Each structure stands twice: as structure tokens, then as C-alpha cells.
Regions:
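Conserved phosphate- and dinucleotide-binding cores of soluble alpha/beta proteins
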Residues: 1-127
Length: 127
């Protein structure tokens, strides 16, 4: 009988006293940022992540709102090549939605830039 998906990471993270997730800040020699505004699939939701660690630093996300979490992750974990892009997205998305900042027009622009140009740094957000 399967209790959770393959590996059980969801149950493991949800039941952890302090869940810590690690990732490199970039992939493919810097062409892809691991920190992005939105993803098409998640294994662990925002409610399961307490601490995020990259080689850039540590983001303690406990007790923070979605906007505060985004700021903490950008400031502490995003690669310097992508920080300004992520700040730009956050600025565009705040005020357009209620509790969770999101711009549907721009949410996947970084992914689209990579698909079209091979480099997420070529992202152009729309106002």
C-alpha cells in the first residue's frame, strides 16, 4: 500500500521538526537559476520548507508571509546574476494579487527565456 509518492519526501518534510532544503543557486554553468518565481510542478510545498540553503547563503523562512519569504530567498539564496531579475519580478507582482505575490503574465518568463535563448538571464518581464 502506497502512503505517499515515490520516496516519501512529502511525509518526511511535513513531519520534520525543522525541514531544511538544499539546492545549488544555478545549474548548467549559470544558464538556469534554481530560484525562480513559479514552477510547473512541486514535490514539497511552501508549507513544508522551513530553511532553504544554497552556496550563496541560508534563508530562514519560519513565520514569514509569502512576500517576506520571497525577499529572504532572493537576498540570501539567489545567485548574484539573477538577484535583480528576481527583485524586478517581485516588484511587478506585488499589489497585483492578495496574499501571495504573482504576475501570471510574467510567472514563467524565466523558463521561456531559457527555452528560447538558452539563458534565463535574457528574461524580459512585461509591466
Amino acid at each position: 500500500k502506497i502512503m505517499n509518492g515515490i520516496g516519501g519526501s512529502g511525509d518526511f518534510a511535513r513531519n520534520a521538526y525543522l525541514s531544511i532544503f538544499t539546492t545549488p543557486s544555478v545549474a548548467k554553468d549559470g544558464l538556469i537559476s534554481s530560484i525562480v518565481p513559479q514552477v510547473s510542478h512541486v514535490d514539497s510545498t511552501e508549507h513544508d520548507v522551513r530553511i532553504l540553503v544554497t552556496e550563496q547563503g541560508v534563508a530562514d523562512l519560519r513565520g514569514k508571509s509569502p512576500s517576506q519569504r520571497a525577499r529572504c530567498i532572493i537576498e540570501n539564496c539567489a545567485h548574484p546574476d539573477y538577484k535583480q531579475l528576481l527583485w524586478d519580478y517581485l516588484k511587478l507582482s506585488e499589489g497585483k494579487s492578495c496574499h501571495t505575490p504573482m504576475s501570471l503574465r510574467n510567472a514563467f518568463k524565466m523558463h521561456i527565456a531559457y527555452a528560447e535563448t538558452g539563458d534565463m538571464r535574457n528574461t524580459q518581464f512585461e509591466s
